[in-house]
């Protein structure tokens, strides 16, 4: 009788632990869905911004990398990077950040955003356009490096956040 009572106690403990674990999972799931797509987008922007300041700023004294706040013809990109020799700008890149929110039913593809990015780049007179994206997470094409999509839109690339520095230093 003692043996079966021990098993019963263990089973009840196990059930209680499982309930707590399940509640934690629900809590984090809920938290993650509350972090709206915009917030997730913000964190991608923060990632690139911080990376730029820490890794690239020391080597590029005249470079500018910042949020595009000027609306031109109803257009605003996410970020613009430009660099100069102190007087003459010799490169400018329009960046658009896209992040997959797991709660979004509609799965966007990277190519869905290229037309608008190209329009933004032209209106802002940037030489290059880059989509920094976590969309299509299981795509080998995007996971292996810098993807040149210039055959679709001139001077345009799609990258994962970890290729941000390699792209700018090309």
Where are these predicted regions, by residue range?
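Amphipathic, heptad-repeat alpha-helical coiled-coil/stalk segments that mediate oligomerization
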Residues: 34-39, 45-170
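Residues forming the hydrophobic interface stripe of long heptad-repeat coiled-coil alpha-helices
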Residues: 1-34
């Amino acid at each position: 009788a003692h043996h079966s009572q021990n098993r019963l106690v263990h089973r009840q403990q196990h059930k209680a632990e499982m309930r707590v674990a399940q509640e934690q999972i629900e809590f984090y799931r809920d938290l993650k869905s509350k972090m709206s797509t915009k917030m997730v987008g913000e964190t991608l922007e923060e990632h690139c911004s911080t990376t730029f300041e820490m890794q690239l700023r020391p080597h590029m004294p005249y470079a500018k990398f910042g949020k595009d706040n000027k609306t031109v013809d109803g257009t605003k990109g996410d970020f613009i990077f430009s660099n100069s020799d102190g007087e003459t700008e010799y490169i400018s890149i329009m960046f658009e950040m896209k992040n997959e929110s797991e709660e979004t039913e509609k799965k966007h593809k990277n190519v869905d955003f290229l037309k608008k990015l190209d329009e933004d780049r032209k209106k802002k007179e940037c030489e290059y356009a880059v989509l920094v994206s976590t969309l299509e997470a299981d795509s080998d094409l995007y996971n292996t490096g810098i993807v040149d999509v210039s055959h679709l839109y001139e001077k345009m690339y799609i990258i994962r956040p970890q290729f941000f520095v390699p792209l700018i230093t090309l």
